[in-house]
Amino acid sequence: MKKIHPSAVIEEGAQLGDDVVIEAYAYVSKDAKIGNNVVIKQGARILSDTTIGDHSRVFSYAIVGDIPQDISYKEEQKSGVVIGKNATIREFATINSGTAKGDGFTRIGDNAFIMAYCHIAHDCLLGNNIILANNATLAGHVELGDFTVVGGLTPIHQFVKVGEGCMIAGASALSQDIVPFCLAEGNRASIRSLNLVGIRRRFDKDEVDRLSRAFKTLFRQGDLKENAKNLLENQESENVKKMCHFILETKRGIPVYRGKNNA
C-alpha cells in the first residue's frame, strides 16, 4: 500500500510502484518513475525523467534530476537520471540530469550508497556497489567502475575514469584516470598501491596474488603502456587484463605512482 503525505506534490503522470512511501513536502515530477518499496523522505525532490529502482531511499532535501549545471544545456532537451535498485541517497545530495553530450541521462547502478552533500554532475556513469562518502563531488562525464569507493571531500575532474574496485582516499583531488583495483591518494591524487582491502573482500588468495604481481610489474619500472602490453601476452587473469586494457585505453593519463613497491 502506498503511503503519501497530504502535503507531498505528485505531478500527474508520475509512475509510482507498490508500497511507495512519500513523506511531507516531497516533490515528484510528472515524468518520474519510482520503483516498488521506495521511500522518499521529507522535502526530497525527484525531477525530470528520473527512474529510481526498487527498495531505494532518498533522504530529506536530496535533489535528483534537476537540470545540469552546463551553460550549453537547453531545457527542451530530454534528460534525466537512472538509478538502480537498493540505492541510498542521503541528505542534501544532488544528482543532475544528463545532456545531449551524452545520452541525456546520468546513470547509477544498483546498491549505490551516496552520503550527505555529495554532488553527481551531468552524464556521470556509475557502476554497481558504489560508495561516495560525504561531500564527494563528481564533475560532468565522470565514470566510476563497480565497487569503487570515493572518500569524503574529494572532487573528481570532468571526464575522469576510475576503474573497477578502486579506493580514492578522502580529501584527495583527482584529475587523471585510476587503474582498476588501485588505491589513489593526494592532491593531485596518484596511485599508491593496490586496494588490498577491497580485493581481499571479493577475490580468493590466488587472485589477490596475481593482482599484486601485476601491479608490481606495471608500476615498478619502465614505460607503463609497454608494461601493460607485455603483461597482456598469455595473460589468464581477467582482472589483470582489465588493468592492462584500462592503461592502454586511458585518455587523461595515469597519475605518477609514488607508493612503495610492496603491494
Swiss-Prot record:
Pfam annotation, one family: Hexapep
Domain of life: Bacteria
Main location: cytoplasm
GO terms under biological process: lipid A biosynthetic process
EC number, as in UniProt: 2.3.1.129
Annotated GO CC locations: cytoplasm; membrane
PROSITE patterns listed in its UniProt record: HEXAPEP_TRANSFERASES (PS00101)
InterPro entries per the UniProt record, alphabetical: Acetyltransf_C, Acetyltransf_C_sf, Hexapep, Hexapep_transf_CS, Lipid_A_LpxA, Trimer_LpxA-like_sf
Gene Ontology MF term list: acyl-[acyl-carrier-protein]-UDP-N-acetylglucosamine O-acyltransferase activity
CDD domains from the UniProt entry: LbH_UDP-GlcNAc_AT
Keywords: Acyltransferase, Cytoplasm, Lipid A biosynthesis, Lipid biosynthesis, Lipid metabolism, Repeat, Transferase
Gene3D superfamilies linked to this entry: Hexapeptide repeat proteins (2.160.10.10), Udp N-acetylglucosamine O-acyltransferase, C-terminal domain (1.20.1180.10)
Involved pathway(s): Glycolipid biosynthesis; lipid IV(A) biosynthesis; lipid IV(A) from (3R)-3-hydroxytetradecanoyl-[acyl-carrier-protein] and UDP-N-acetyl-alpha-D-glucosamine: step 1/6
Compartments, as annotated in UniProt: Cytoplasm
Disulfide bonds: none
PANTHER family associated with the record: ACYL-[ACYL-CARRIER-PROTEIN]--UDP-N-ACETYLGLUCOSAMINE O-ACYLTRANSFERASE (PTHR43480), ACYL-[ACYL-CARRIER-PROTEIN]--UDP-N-ACETYLGLUCOSAMINE O-ACYLTRANSFERASE, MITOCHONDRIAL-RELATED (PTHR43480:SF1)
Record note on quaternary structure: Homotrimer.
Described purpose of this protein according to its UniProt entry: Involved in the biosynthesis of lipid A, a phosphorylated glycolipid that anchors the lipopolysaccharide to the outer membrane of the cell.
Name of the protein: Acyl-[acyl-carrier-protein]--UDP-N-acetylglucosamine O-acyltransferase
Species whose genome carries this gene: Campylobacter jejuni subsp. jejuni serotype O:2 (strain ATCC 700819 / NCTC 11168)
Organism lineage: Bacteria, Pseudomonadati, Campylobacterota, Epsilonproteobacteria, Campylobacterales
Name of the encoding gene: lpxA
